[in-house]
Curated annotation (Swiss-Prot):
It comes from the Bacteria. Catalyzes the complicated ring closure reaction between the two acyclic compounds 1-deoxy-D-xylulose-5-phosphate (DXP) and 3-amino-2-oxopropyl phosphate (1-amino-acetone-3-phosphate or AAP) to form pyridoxine 5'-phosphate (PNP) and inorganic phosphate. The gene is pdxJ. This is Pyridoxine 5'-phosphate synthase. Homooctamer; tetramer of dimers.
């Protein structure tokens, strides 16, 4: 089976747009769990543009599945994670001016920093994942820093300008998923996946979990959050049938 991690960031984006206390990302997370989500993913960004510390603290107590906290590799965020102790943490690159995470974490360039963060988080009992581009050198670096999980960045696949380019990106993801799996890593994937492009990624047998958020929140505007989650989960399961 393949697992679905529902990212609730953009429920919080809508809330923050007007500075209200609704819509509640807490409620969205609980509805997602009831509707088939296997994990709840949320990104506490340094600029706090959507998810807030209070959201993380409340959800850590209320979730029945797993919390997958996305975080930059900074002292502030690593210390916060060690205090809250999510089930999983996915370390991601972060720039304040970006609309969304634009690429994978450069584990090679930031090797010492990532290695130290992995050690601290692991000692705190948190499973560490690294959000990386589908490249063998980055996967090898993830192994060397001691991360047991990687999340392959699917943005280049999703944003490819032509069907030929998209197919080439898919083949890269497929081969790198197999490579990482053969090296003993759990392989997750995510970024810019939606209802029209998820099936080929979900079909890759080495991939354990997909993290999807924006597309589900957008679909929920028309059919409701619970049904949007159920549709995505069904789509993923059918890819493996």
């Amino acid at each position: 089976m393949i697992a679905l991690g529902v990212n609730i960031d953009h429920v919080a984006t809508l809330r923050q747009a007007r500075g209200t206390d609704y819509p509640s990302p807490i409620k969205a997370a609980l509805v997602a769990e009831e509707s088939g989500a296997d994990a709840i993913t949320l990104h506490l960004r340094e600029d706090r543009r959507h998810i807030q510390e209070e959201d993380v603290i409340i959800l850590r107590e209320r979730l029945k599945t797993r919390m997958n906290l996305e975080s930059a590799v900074t002292e502030e965020m690593i210390s916060f994670a060690c205090r809250i102790k999510p089930h999983d943490i996915c370390l991601v690159p972060e720039r304040r001016e970006e609309l969304t995470t634009e690429g994978g974490l450069d584990v090679i360039r930031h090797f010492d920093q990532v290695s130290a963060a992995c050690k601290r988080l692991t000692e705190a009992g948190i499973r560490v994942s690294l959000f990386v581009d589908a490249r063998a050198d980055q996967i090898d670096a993830a192994i060397r820093v001691g991360a047991p999980v990687i999340e392959l960045h699917t943005g280049h696949y999703a944003d490819a300008a032509t069907s030929e380019a998209q197919q080439a990106e898919l083949e890269t993801i497929r081969s790198m998923a197999a490579y990482a799996f053969s090296r003993g890593l759990q392989v997750n994937a995510g970024h810019s996946l939606h209802y029209q492009n998820t099936t080929p990624i979900a079909f890759i047998p080495e991939i354990t979990e997909l993290n999807i958020g924006h597309a589900i929140v957008a679909r929920a505007l028309f059919i409701g959050f619970a049904q949007a989650v159920r549709e995505m989960k069904t789509l993923m399961q059918e890819a493996r049938a």
